[in-house]
Amino acid sequence: MEKPNWIFLGNTFPELNKIHMHSKTAQLGHGVGPKKSYYSKSDSSTTVRFVESDYRFNRLCEMYPEDNFQNVGFCKMDPIINGEENGIDFTKLGFDNNKKTILYAPTFYPSSIERFSKNFPADLENYNIIIKPHFFSMSKQKYLKQRELLHHWESFNNTYLAKVNDYSLLPYLKSADLMISDASSAIIEFAALNKPVIWCTFLQLRWNYRGIFSYRFKARMDKDYDDYGQIARPANSYNEMIKQAKNLLDSNFTQSNQANEYLKKLAGTLDGNASKRIVTFLLENC
């Protein structure tokens, strides 16, 4: 049986030595979020890991000096930057094309979903709302309460709930005018398109992450977490989030120079050629 030259991994893998007897391995993360796991994915050494920015490249080289890292840029955004991603057909969703569109893209935990009002779509009735939850929110039994709330919001005329098999966030990033999210890679991705983002800091935490146990939440996050406030508008409550959403959509938004500096720090080069650089490296190192 023919063996592949390269195998891609998205996380740590305990038996790389067996793979390396036959093939080379490349690691490529699915996002650039603030969790410490972004860096600890390199605890198992792949042949190469592709990273997005000078900052991340330098940190990883310092943490894992024996490993091979290649700074190629943020390839996930290439289809939008190159004009290959067409976005969403609002007509098929039953949306009013004259209204601006809000993308709510929460993560599964810790999440803002349970902290939102049951009347969330009504509070923003003058806008189209697309809800793109994390796959776990839509599939795991432990997040049933989240699903119940999501399906309730889906019943509003101005709201579309993405299906489980709508796995790609890119069409929604392309088409929306404003994004509301928790601390996730999506914040950086949307802001990189020079669009406004609201970062929900009011989260539903399990009891063992609250009060004297709050250190557990902080332990999940990397120091990059603090940079999100420079890229997105933090909202500390639901009512503050609603007010900010209306204000941002009614204004002529332009990303600040400071925000652009932080975006470059975390997401690196966004020239549409990151994927080509990856392919070139693979072909030259077969």
Each language-model region and where it sits:
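Active-site and donor-binding regions of nucleotide-sugar-utilizing enzymes
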Residues: 1-84
